């Protein structure tokens, strides 16, 4: 079940800046939408919509950027690999949960404020 790689724009300007856009991914594979209780609409609630479009002008000027194409619903690039919500990922016992994972915002988000729990069933860890 491959996910889209990020768009990487090399640095070509004379300023030491790299822009990261981790939550703008909108390449939703059909299988991801099918796993979600609320469908695509529920998954869109996790996006930072159109931030990637805002960055395009800086990329045109040579500023480096890494722009996620994979949606945050599939993987949150701002989470550590051990920030696992056990209600989302079947992984066996977890020694301690981060506050974000306990709140449903682990490496694979488990809920949104508007839609509640996202997934029809837990995802096996080997699928990560």
Each predicted region: which residue ranges?
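N-terminal catalytic or cofactor-binding beta/alpha core of small enzyme domains
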Residues: 1-128
């Amino acid at each position: 079940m491959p996910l889209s790689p990020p768009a990487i724009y090399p640095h070509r300007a004379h300023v030491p800046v790299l822009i990261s856009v981790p939550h703008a991914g909108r390449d939703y594979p059909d299988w991801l939408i099918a796993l979600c209780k609320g469908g695509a609409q529920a998954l869109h609630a996790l996006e930072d919509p159109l931030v990637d479009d805002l960055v395009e002008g800086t990329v045109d000027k040579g500023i480096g950027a890494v722009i996620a194409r994979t949606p945050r619903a599939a993987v949150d690039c701002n989470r550590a690999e051990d920030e696992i919500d056990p209600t989302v990922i079947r992984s066996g016992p977890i020694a301690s949960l981060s506050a974000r994972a306990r709140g449903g915002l682990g490496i694979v988000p488990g809920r949104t404020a508007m839609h509640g729990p996202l997934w029809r069933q837990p995802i096996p860890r080997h699928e990560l």
